[in-house]
Amino acid sequence: MAMIKKNRKVNPLSLLVVCVVPLNCCSTIIAKCDYLKLVLQWPKSFCLINSRKCQRNPLPSNFTIHGLWPDNYTRQAPQSCTTNNFQRFTDTDIEQRMEESWPDLKQQSIAGLSYNFWQDQWRKHGSCCFPPHESEIYFLKALELKDRLDVLTILENNNFNPGTPQPFSVLRVFNTISRAIGKTPILKCAQSYLKEVVICVDNNGASVVHCPRSRPRPRPRRDPCPFSDVKFP
């Protein structure tokens, strides 16, 4: 017959160690990420739609980065995977590129004011698919994708020029970008303005992939661009 062991006193400190270690380890979680979405916003549209929030002057004359966001095909997109801050850029060239290509349009054109915006993007999105020590790699990847894909040049080469008074066919804009990048993007519109262009890439950011549910469908309420025609201010 098995003997029943007497209860031994447990040192409270040993329990404390067991509890603290997981909390420290889990301050950053790398989530499953099937692909990344490069979200490019048109500054003039942003400011027309959000006139009270827009503080940038002068406005950039090219698409700027809203974010590089992880997503999944069959499950909810991961968000807010860390509470840790990213390290400030030590390379002034990188910071200058960030100010030009990834500015906070809600802030004035003063160096350093976009850091909170970048911090939010890192905590909410970048930290879910890049390790904590690779925050700079995350930002550099977004900059590289924006320069390589160059949506404004694609549109201008096909006579979609910003500032043109007449609206453009949403389907034509969609097809033009699709042909140029070889995959389907997502167009986002508001108040009949072209607000954002989303291009999807694999989870390494190496190759462009099709964005799910991307083809425009005029007038459905939940479509990201529910218009037949759109203005490109």
UniProtKB/Swiss-Prot annotation:
The keyword Signal belongs to this UniProt entry's keyword annotation: yes
Keyword set includes Lyase: yes
Enzyme Commission numbers on file: 4.6.1.19
Localization (cell): Secreted, Extracellular space
Active site: 66 (proton donor), 121, 125 (proton acceptor)
Record's keyword terms, sorted: Disulfide bond, Endonuclease, Glycoprotein, Hydrolase, Lyase, Nuclease, Secreted, Signal
Matching InterPro entries: Ribonuclease_T2_eukaryotic, RNase_T2-like, RNase_T2-like_sf, RNase_T2_His_AS_1, RNase_T2_His_AS_2
Region (Disordered): 211-233
Pfam families in UniProt: Ribonuclease_T2 (PF00445)
The protein, known as: Ribonuclease S-4
Organism: Antirrhinum hispanicum
Phylogenetic classification of the source organism: Eukaryota, Viridiplantae, Streptophyta, Embryophyta, Tracheophyta
